[in-house]
Amino acid sequence: MTSTVQSVQTFGRKKTATAVAHCKKGQGLIKVNGRPLEFLEPQILRIKLQEPLLLVGKERFQDVDIRIRVSGGGHVAQIYAVRQALAKALVAYYHKYVDEQSKRELKNIFAAYDKSLLVADPRRRESKKFGGPGARARYQKSYR
């Protein structure tokens, strides 16, 4: 009676944006915040989102459904967080439910193209200090 659903959960981060991906057996649906990839705006950044799909081919995504929830950050940071979560979800699913050889193949493809598909960028905003308008800039002095 109890049927276990084959699923994995991964996350992607960029600056303050966090994307959580749920990957399970399905028919190839990929949704971000309840919307299909084709309807995401801005359109120029949609190509960045489709990079993992184009790199490994759509046939690898045919038997999985991926739901991604993203929050925080700006538009570009969210797109980068989503693409990282997407790539990591596929690798984790193949590792857990398919085979090790396919997983290693996927990881090598992603790493060769862009390492940020699998590894988060650790850079964060530097905090503002006193004596100036920003983190490093100082207020101008006048000697009169």
Curated annotation (Swiss-Prot):
Keywords: Acetylation, Ribonucleoprotein, Ribosomal protein. GO terms for cellular component: cytosolic small ribosomal subunit. Residues 124-144 are annotated as: Disordered. The modification N-acetylthreonine is found at T2. The keyword Transport does not apply. GO terms for biological process: maturation of SSU-rRNA from tricistronic rRNA transcript (SSU-rRNA, 5.8S rRNA, LSU-rRNA); translation. GO terms for molecular function: RNA binding; structural constituent of ribosome. The keyword Ribosomal protein applies. It comes from the Eukaryota. SUPFAM superfamilies: Ribosomal protein S5 domain 2-like (SSF54211). Disulfide bonds: none annotated. Belongs to the universal ribosomal protein uS9 family. This is Small ribosomal subunit protein uS9.
